[in-house]
Amino acid sequence: MLQCIFLISDSGEVMLEKQLTGHRVDRSICAWFWDQYISQGDSFKALPVIASPTHYLFQIVRDGITFLACSQVEMPPLMAIEFLCRVADVLSEYLGGLNEDLIKDNFIIVYELLDEMIDNGFPLTTEPSILKEMIAPPNLVSKMLSVVTGNASNVSDTLPSGAGSCVPWRPTDPKYSSNEVYVDLVEEMDAIVNRDGELVKCEIYGEVQMNSQLTGFPDLTLSFANPSILEDMRFHPCVRYRPWESHQVLSFVPPDGEFKLMSYRVKKLKNTPVYVKPQITSDSGTCRISVLVGIRSDPGKTIESITLSFQLPHCVSSADLSSNHGTVTILSNKTCTWTIGRIPKDKTPCLSGTLALEPGLERLHVFPTFKLGFKIMGIALSGLRIEKLDLQTIPPRLYKGFRAQTRAGEFDVRL
């Protein structure tokens, strides 16, 4: 049972406090939490569950905002974390994003949503389709009316029609003049390359994202050409488990609008589309650096938005870096970013220059880790392919669209 939820900005300010039970949680717990973060750094915010002297704390971080929940009794931690993730997703969908200004400008709506989503410390209504029938999303007209009439509440006077439905994630009878459904494969490649250039780890985290604009209650079936490569699948509640377990086919009645149908991982990949070859030599207080970036295996689509960033060691007093392609920027916190864009066909992009060490140091003993970024549109590097999307009750003039994209996730090259 959760007793309180706090929303904390990236500067430590408590933007919102929602007491959930009769036992009030003092705000001093947030001061303790922030003091621990200041003393321990980012590693503290990576902990999903924290035992404070007085409470169990559960936290997630989204776009610089910390969602912090408190409880004095033992409870399943995954339930608390999953609920906080659902709160963040709902707020992002309602407000069109997550940042400090949006939450402060829509303070009343955030409170109303939390009132409906949790009751006496237990999750209650978390489906966006039902919440939107209870509480209207903010818009310019509603804000102007609230100023004129003095009524700031967005709560509806009618019971949501989906509350009694067998599929609570979908409105009772949505209607569209044109019936459309879009399927996106969105993948991230996580990789680690050691100092010898060997691929230590390479795997894909992917999501099947959909946008359904279909009339009535469509029953969809989505099948893959090679589902055996998938691991660690997580499904939206609309997915029926039995067809997947028996035939590895996704059978579901979709929510209305955009949603994530499933997530998955594809592990132990043998190759990456881009290579990074860094080299650093140091002598007499000066280091020479050279980094080559090129295409290792052509995916068949253009590799775009290539970037390479690394943190200069603290012992480096100054840096003089340049490249034969793209731009190089060095920030005041010693973060160097090389923006390459696309790799040209006539030359290999190269970053080179010198690093000056602090007085008294002859050689560099701490080497940076290079982080690669890229994006490839039109292909899923995992090799996952959608075979077909069938509708059991086909509406007239149905349009189906499929897309895929892969981008770099945690892609580290160590030296």
Swiss-Prot record:
It is a peripheral membrane protein. Residues 178-414 form the MHD domain. Its main location: cytoplasm. It comes from the Eukaryota. Pfam families: Adap_comp_sub. It is found in: Cytoplasm; Golgi apparatus; Cytoplasmic vesicle membrane. Coiled coil: none annotated. Part of the AP-3 complex, an adaptor-related complex which seems to be clathrin-associated. The complex is associated with the Golgi region as well as more peripheral structures. It facilitates the budding of vesicles from the Golgi membrane and may be directly involved in trafficking to the vacuole. It also functions in maintaining the identity of lytic vacuoles and in regulating the transition between storage and lytic vacuoles. This is AP-3 complex subunit mu.
